[in-house]
């Protein structure tokens, strides 16, 4: 309630497991559903849901449910890496994370958009699946993909998804060539505009100009505070 009263545009929720020294929640969609019932305007985003650890159909149902409960305010931020010990604890091979991410994302999109579908993949197989409920936003809640490696920047740009940039260390200007690769791939794939993205860092900047001037401040909780919008407005995209 207070966050919306103060004018926040969005609230972002992480997924962290088995790390009590730094994690305050492990189930971002459950928290998102709670926030949705106490707010009316601001966006609610996951930052990020670790797809290789999720059952894709169950996740699709939960995402659609939260999108309905929030009146279409969900931003579905997704990622791959997380921490190797989390994968081991869940019994998932960390070396499979890239392939699992791609397969889960494919299943999610099909579940959101197809009336009925079957899937025969490496990790999951389904026959004649029909998702219920369906998300309110069409074709799906905005899917924002986290990127760290140069290859991922290009892949996300080619797919035409907004990007989530983690900038916890170093100078924001070091990200300029990576974001350029994202924007180049975006254009080469024929998508309109220059791409869109969010940056998660220890800075909570009122604007790109403020960031460029070196003015930074911690978020209210002292945790990383994402900013989002058109990639042309990012301070490291000039």
What are these regions (language model features)?
Residues 45-51:
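Structural motif corresponding to the early beta-alpha repeats
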Residues 14-15, 48, 166-168:
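Short beta->alpha connector loops at strand-helix junctions that form conserved
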Residues 23-26, 62-63, 222-228:
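Aromatic- and acidic-residue-enriched segments that line the glycan-binding/catalytic groove
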Residues 52-165, 172-180, 184-195:
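Internal, glycine-rich beta/alpha segment that forms the wall or movable "lid"
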Residues 1-38, 42-44, 138-141:
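N-terminal beta1-alpha1-beta2 module of alpha/beta enzyme domains
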Residues 1-8, 75, 165, 172-183, ...:
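C-terminal amphipathic alpha-helical "assembly" element
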Residues 17-26, 52-57, 170-175, 213:
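Acidic-and-aromatic substrate-binding clefts and catalytic sites of carbohydrate-active enzymes
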Residues 33-37, 106-110, 222-225, 229:
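Generic alpha-helical structural context detector
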């Amino acid at each position: 309630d207070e966050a919306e009263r103060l004018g926040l545009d969005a609230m972002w929720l992480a997924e962290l497991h088995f790390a009590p020294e730094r994690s305050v929640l492990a189930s971002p969609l459950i928290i998102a559903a709670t926030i949705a019932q106490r707010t009316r305007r601001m966006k609610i985003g996951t930052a990020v849901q670790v797809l290789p650890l999720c059952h894709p159909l169950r996740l699709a149902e939960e995402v659609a449910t939260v999108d309905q409960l929030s009146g279409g305010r969900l931003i579905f931020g997704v990622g791959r890496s997380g921490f190797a010990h989390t994968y081991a604890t869940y019994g998932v091979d960390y070396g499979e994370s890239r392939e699992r991410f791609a397969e889960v994302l494919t299943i999610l999109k099909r579940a959101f958009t197809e009336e009925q579908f079957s899937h025969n993949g490496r990790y999951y197989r389904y026959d004649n699946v029909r998702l219920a409920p369906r998300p309110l936003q069409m074709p799906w809640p905005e899917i924002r993909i986290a990127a760290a490696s140069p290859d991922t920047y290009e892949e996300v740009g080619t797919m035409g998804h907004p990007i989530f940039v983690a900038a916890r260390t170093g100078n924001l200007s070091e990200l300029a060539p990576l974001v350029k690769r994202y924007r180049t791939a975006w254009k080469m794939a024929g998508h309109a505009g220059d791409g869109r993205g969010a940056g998660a860092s220890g800075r909570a900047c009122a604007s790109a100009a403020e960031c460029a001037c070196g003015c930074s401040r911690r978020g209210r909780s002292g945790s990383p505070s994402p900013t989002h919008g058109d990639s042309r407005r990012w301070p490291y995209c000039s």
